[in-house]
Amino acid sequence: MDFDEILHHVGDSGRFQICMIILLNILSLVLSPHDVLENFTAAIPAHHCSINLDNSRSEVSTDMNLTTEDLMKVSIPMGPNQKPEQCRRFRYTQWQFLDSNISTFNSTELETEPCLDGWTYDHSVFTSTIVTEWDLVCDFQSFKYYAQATSLAGHLVSCPLSGIISDRFGRKPLLMYCSLAYGAVGTYCAFAPNFSVYCVLRFLLSAFQSTILINSLILVLEEASVQWHPTIIVLSGLFNSIGQGVLGGLAYVISDWHLLQLAYALPFFIFFVLFCWVPESVRWLIITGKTDQAWKELQRIASINGKKGIAQNLTTEDLRSKLKKDVNSTGKLFRIKDIFINPLIRKIVLSNSSLLFAELFSFVGLLLDVQLLGKNMFLTQIFLGAIDVPSKSLTYFTIRNVSRRPLIAFLLLTTGSCITITIFISEEMYVLRTIIFILGKGCFAAFTCISTTYINELSPVELRSTLNGVFLAVVRLAGVLSALTLATRKYFVYLPMILYGVLPIVATISILFLPETFNLPHTDIIKDMEKRKRLMSKNISKKEGQDFLETTEC
């Protein structure tokens, strides 16, 4: 009796699995906004230098009734866009600007200075953000993007570590303690005393977020029937997108960054309690030899699924038999360096990494700063989340009917073109800019689904998890560098957009070095990949080709 048969006896698609899927989707809904939360908690409102009139330097007494508009006129110079300068003020108060008899002044020749007394912020949209709290504007504006890069670096560190810890100690303990830690650290983050502490806490939160998302998905998949796996993955992806859309509406209601951070941190104390109830992965328990505990967990699952009587007939000997079978079927373990020894694998890793890096680099940066996309950032965030639903749904059908290489090339070219076109559209035409960005976001969402499928089709079973780890590291690195690229706006305002637009277009060349996998059998070992390559180039005998098709899975 193998594990799938054992799981079928206690129920592999019953009430327990439904509860687990619901829990996973709620987790996805709450966790998915983590990386884009700083679109709102770190939003940059309109601002100008604080006005501090110094009578000792003034030529006119200030004992008069002056409106805010008058004070701005005599204290803040106008910028090239005929709006008040955000980072400079007049060195001396220019009282002559109040004289209605004088029509024009050339304010560009007047002496200015930085904002020595701080800034005044427009609180009409956001009552508080980390930008207003720690004055992350002007010369310090790049600190916002450094904070985002630091946060994304938490994912880069946690992905390999969480996998090792999870395989060593189990899924459940990691989910329990990371949920508790996310709630505690997230709550403290909402009241961080300074910017440095805030960055460290966001780094930790990202590490916990990745760990929870990855291990919760693994736990649910390991406890469910294989036929449920596509549905589970698609639902998780859709709730990810819905969660990002919900963030736009929630941020509109909660305009204080402290409260918004708390709103996403406090639910994890509830998740901690729920994970205390969730059984450990039976599959992991069997593989690690904990058959007695696995038997107890199977009894719980059977009871929830209404099959308690059937489960009573299951003995620990059945589980030990399954364990023995798994141990005997274990083959050679591959190391990371083995990927780069084989030229075929090496070419796949390098080419596919360039595609993933380009696409993720181009759009992650934009998702981290939706203020670039249009005037109403709340609606933009909602639309960016909503567009994923039809996009990912449509992708399900294109995967079944369209070749991989031309589809991926089309998505890369469209994404890069959408970003590049917006450079030439003025900010006043924000509706058109938003529509084009949403089209690009739809292509990005489709790319994430199709690339996941393509990676699994390219990778042999014996190397699949290792290659996925390599590609995941590339994706996280792209996110970190994408956030840092936003800081280059202070040198040339269009530089991030140029890089985001050009890179996917250039990276399309890499698709030429990858094989087509549509309607071809999946491979189990590297030798199967080499046979598949020869089959496509017709450099293989008829008998070898027939053997290959018979011995590989479709």
From Swiss-Prot:
InterPro entries, A to Z: MFS, MFS_dom, MFS_trans_sf, Sugar_transporter_CS
Instruction: List the ranges whose topology is Cytoplasmic.
Output: 1-15, 166-172, 221-231, 280-347, 398-405, 456-466, 513-554
Q: Which residues lie on this side of the membrane: Extracellular?
A: 37-144, 194-199, 253-258, 369-376, 427-434, 488-491
The GO annotation for biological process reads: monoatomic ion transport; sodium-independent prostaglandin transport
Per its UniProt record, what Gene3D superfamilies does this chain match?
A: MFS general substrate transporter like domains
Highest taxon, organism lineage:
Eukaryota
The record's account of tissue expression is: Specifically expressed in kidney where it is found in proximal convoluted tubules (at protein level). Colocalizes with the prostaglandin-inactivating enzyme HPGD in kidney (at protein level). Not detected in other tissues tested.
Q: Which CDD domains does UniProt cross-reference here? A: MFS_OAT
How does the entry describe its membrane topology?
A: Multi-pass membrane protein
Keywords, sorted A to Z: Cell membrane, Glycoprotein, Ion transport, Membrane, Transmembrane, Transmembrane helix, Transport
The regions listed as transmembrane in this protein's record are 16-36, 145-165, 173-193, 200-220, 232-252, 259-279, 348-368, 377-397, 406-426, 435-455, 467-487, 492-512
Q: Name one GO molecular function term.
A: prostaglandin receptor activity
Q: Where is it located?
A: Basolateral cell membrane
Q: Name one GO cellular component term.
A: basolateral plasma membrane
Activity as a function of temperature:
High activity at 37 degrees Celsius. Little or no activity at 0 degrees Celsius.
A Pfam entry, by short name: MFS_1
Q: Which residues are glycosylated?
A: N39, N194
Q: What family is reported? A: Belongs to the major facilitator (TC 2.A.1) superfamily. Organic cation transporter (TC 2.A.1.19) family.
Q: What does this protein do?
A: Sodium-independent organic anion transporter which exhibits high specificity for a subset of prostaglandins including prostaglandin E2 (PGE2), prostaglandin E1 (PGE1), prostaglandin F2-alpha (PGF2-alpha) and prostaglandin D2 (PGD2).
How is this protein named in the record? Solute carrier family 22 member 22
